[in-house]
From Swiss-Prot:
A GO term, aspect molecular function: cytoskeletal motor activity
Keyword tags: Bacterial flagellum, Cell inner membrane, Cell membrane, Chemotaxis, Flagellar rotation, Membrane
Organism: Pseudomonas aeruginosa (strain ATCC 15692 / DSM 22644 / CIP 104116 / JCM 14847 / LMG 12228 / 1C / PRS 101 / PAO1)
NCBIfam families cross-referenced by the UniProt entry: fliN
Region feature Disordered, mapped onto this chain: 24-67
Purpose: FliN is one of three proteins (FliG, FliN, FliM) that form the rotor-mounted switch complex (C ring), located at the base of the basal body. This complex interacts with the CheY and CheZ chemotaxis proteins, in addition to contacting components of the motor that determine the direction of flagellar rotation.
GO cellular component, one term: plasma membrane
GO biological process: bacterial-type flagellum-dependent cell motility; chemotaxis
Entry protein name: Flagellar motor switch protein FliN
Pfam families to which the protein is assigned, alphabetical: FliMN_C (PF01052)
Annotated family: Belongs to the FliN/MopA/SpaO family.
Entry annotated with the keyword Cell inner membrane: yes
Gene: fliN
Length: 157
């Protein structure tokens, strides 16, 4: 019985809220308010008045604006972007104490043996290995092993 009183009280409160809202709107008559109270505040849900768009209007292929003359990606745009290429002979970790003690003539031992190939890095990403050569009295590098594009992409992830 307590549950019935609770439901009735909730329905009455909902009906009172609707009546107050309709009274504020000013276009509600007393008959409308009485009808809402008689229904217990339950009002039928009205269907939306706007019709739904048929699914065939939303085709599977999007119709993006096209620029004339560009069928695929234009890779020429990125071919002139400068990149930094560097060769790494080797590396090592030292403490700041040892770093501060370095001076002219100090020797730093690296992790690679003499004659081992160098790492060729483009913007910090390893792309190849090579050996040092001299070209017109300048250092150069002869590539001995180039990493495949798929392996380079894997390293980026």
């Amino acid at each position: 019985m307590a549950d019935e009183e609770k439901v009735t009280t909730e329905e009455q409160a909902l009906a009172d809220e609707w009546a107050a809202a309709l009274a504020e709107a000013g276009d509600a008559s007393q008959d409308d308010i009485d009808a809402l109270m008689a229904q217990g505040g339950a009002t039928p849900v009205a269907e939306p008045s706007t019709p739904r768009a048929p699914m065939e209007e939303f085709g599977a292929s999007p119709k993006a604006p096209t620029i004339s003359g560009l069928e695929g990606p234009n890779l020429d745009v990125i071919l002139d972007i400068p990149v930094t290429i560097s060769m790494e002979v080797g590396h090592t970790d030292i403490s700041i104490r040892n770093l501060l003690q370095l001076n002219q003539g100090s020797v730093i031992e690296l992790d690679r043996l003499a004659g081992e190939p160098l790492d060729v890095l483009v913007n910090g990403t390893l792309i190849a290995h090579g050996e040092v050569v001299v070209v017109n009295e300048k250092f150069g590098i002869r590539l001995t092993d180039v990493i495949s594009p798929s392996e380079r992409i894997k390293k980026l992830r």
